[in-house]
Amino acid sequence: MSCNVVVGGFFGDEGKGKIVAYLALKDRPAIVARGGVGPNAGHTVIVDGKKYSLRMIPSGFLNSECRLLIGPGVSVDPGVLAMEIEITGVDSRLGIDPHCPVIEKRHIEQENISEHLKAKLGSTGSGSGACVAERALRTVKTAKDVPELAKYMADVPSEVNEALDKGMGVLVEGTQGTYLSLYHGTYPYCTSKDVCASAICSDVGLGPTRVSDVTLVLKSFVTRVGEGPLPGQLSRDEVLRRGWMEYGTVTGRERRAAPFDFNLARRAVMLNGATQIALTKIDLISPEASGVRSYEELPVKAKEFIERIEGETMRPVTLIGTGPSTFDMIDRRHRE
């Protein structure tokens, strides 16, 4: 089977959690592995009316048969992790690489007393950045040093590669978005490491030739939480009028919003080597699309928007989110 890497194409909050949850349930991969920075970013999953907001556990946990892995590139907060294990009930299916750096209370305190991080850059204050910085100095504690994590220890790179060798499916979940990348984003208004597809693969121990697809998640409008530039930013009143007001999963802060940006989308396709696009929340720019699960039933306005995205990016829009639930989705991956 294949290896599909899911990453964000804007500033995070594109709906990666929904896409990963759908793919985990639809494609039934053997493994869902999480890359990214750490608990500084949250993914929201809604199924059967129940909402899960996750910062550590892979969003594919809804597939009760898959193995859930956290790669060595991800910083782990044991407290956040324990809470999410209890909420999701995945204790027996979870594996954490022993090389994951561990976020300690002092990391969180360092970020929360930093005026530069909190006030100027809009950090979430999760301790992830301080942990990553200490890892670069080679002084950070790792998961193998934490007794309460001992039973979860797993050689994540070996597991994901061996699964692929056996013909099993692997789904890799990225976090945040292309323009929050430390290398390719709006520095210094960015996260503490690269979060593009190549980095997410490295986070879980996958070489580039193991990847079958890179699914770039784009929302039908652009949002950004915290500080930093947002091209085409709308006034708060206009955001409310359009029904685009959202709130950060981790911080609860209002997200600023702007119309879909084709320039950003094209560059994100290039930077991530995207093979396909997943478009979310089309129902918020075309209300008649709400809940639709067939492309033919979409209103003309929505189809024209999708066709323009495909034309401008030269990539197919294969998944289209039409509502908040995981299965509010049009799946065009196997169309003739």
What function would you assign to each model-found segment?
Residues 1-336:
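Non-transmembrane, aqueous-exposed alpha-helical and coiled segments at domain scale
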